[in-house]
Swiss-Prot record:
Role of this protein: Binds directly to 23S ribosomal RNA and is necessary for the in vitro assembly process of the 50S ribosomal subunit. It is not involved in the protein synthesizing functions of that subunit.
Similarity section: Belongs to the bacterial ribosomal protein bL20 family.
Keyword Ribonucleoprotein tagged: yes
InterPro entries (alphabetical): Ribosomal_bL20, RIBOSOMAL_L20_CS, Ribosomal_protein_bL20_C
Protein name: Large ribosomal subunit protein bL20
This protein's record includes keyword rRNA-binding: yes
Protein encoded by which gene: rplT
Keywords noted in UniProt: Ribonucleoprotein, Ribosomal protein, RNA-binding, rRNA-binding
Superkingdom to which the source organism belongs: Bacteria
Protein's GO biological process: ribosomal large subunit assembly; translation
Residue spans crossing the bilayer: none
One Gene Ontology cellular component: ribonucleoprotein complex
Length: 121
């Protein structure tokens, strides 16, 4: 009886890894063993940085809000505290977009936060 080699599955697996290694430098793009380890490492970095991206964007929104709130006479932390006191439930992404694209609307929100802070003092 003929020995089964599993060549179709092996070839498919190797082609998948080599396709993912396209653009890598040197042997890493053409030799399966080196490609496999490089692709695994790349996938690990990919996973890690997808998680990091969320924090990076949050930091960007906070930096933008800090600038916009200081233009309106508040610090970032006092703006957030004032919004909570006023019961305004806007997330940092929406506030940041508002500060960029609708500065007058953001100024109104900042004034409401100021009034809420003055009411609590």
């Amino acid at each position: 009886m003929v020995r089964a080699t599993g060549s179709v599955a092996s070839r498919r697996r190797r082609k998948r890894v080599l396709k993912q290694a396209k653009g890598f430098w040197g042997d890493r793009k053409g030799h399966f063993r080196q490609s496999r380890s490089s692709v695994m490492r790349a996938m690990a970095f990919n996973y890690m940085h997808r998680k990091d991206r969320k924090g990076d964007f949050r930091s960007l929104w906070i930096a933008r809000l800090n600038v916009a709130s200081r233009i309106n006479g508040l610090s970032y932390s006092r703006l957030i505290n004032g919004l909570k006191c006023a019961g305004i439930d806007l997330n940092r992404k929406m506030l940041s977009e508002m500060a960029i694209h609708n500065p007058m609307g953001f100024a109104e929100v900042a004034n409401q936060a100021k009034k809420a802070l003055e009411a609590t003092i």
